[in-house]
C-alpha cells in the first residue's frame, strides 16, 4: 500500500514540474499608418472607421527566437448607430527577419458586432508569434 502511495506521489510531483519562461525585450513592432486606420463598410452599407487602439506585448526566449504574445485592441467608430450592425475585421501580424523576409504570420478574421446605440466599440484580440533574433513585427488591419 505504501509503495502504491509513493508511486502516485512521484507521478503527481513529476507532472507538476514547470518550465520557467525567460522574459526578454520585445522586438520592434510597426503598424504602418495605412494599415493601422481604415474605413470599411458594414453589412448595412454604412461606413465604419477601424483603428488600432493599443497593443500589449509580452516576449519570452524560445531557443534562438523570441515568442511574442500580443493583445491588440481594435476600435470601431460609426456615425449612424440607429440599428445593430456587423463590420468585417481582418487583422494580420507578420514577423520578418533582418532581411525583411517573412518568418511567421498570424491572422484573424471576424465580424464585429455593433450594438444599436453604440457609436464606439472596442475589442481585444490575442495573437502568438515567433520572431527571429534581430527581426521585427508588422501589424495591420484590412
What spans do the regions from the language model cover?
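Transition segment at domain starts
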Residues: 25-63
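Short, solvent-exposed beta-strand/turn "edge" segments of beta-rich domains on protein surfaces
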Residues: 46-49, 56-69, 78-85, 130
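Short, solvent-exposed, Trp/other aromatic-anchored flexible loops in extracytoplasmic proteins
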Residues: 106-135
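C-terminal motif of bacterial Sec signal peptides marking the signal peptidase cleavage site
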Residues: 12-15
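Sec-dependent signal peptide recognition
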Residues: 1-8
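Extended low-complexity, serine/threonine- and proline-enriched intrinsically disordered segments
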Residues: 87-100, 141
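Bacterial signal peptide processing site
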Residues: 17-20
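One-face residue pattern on beta-strands with alternating periodicity enriched for small/polar residues
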Residues: 67-73, 90, 138
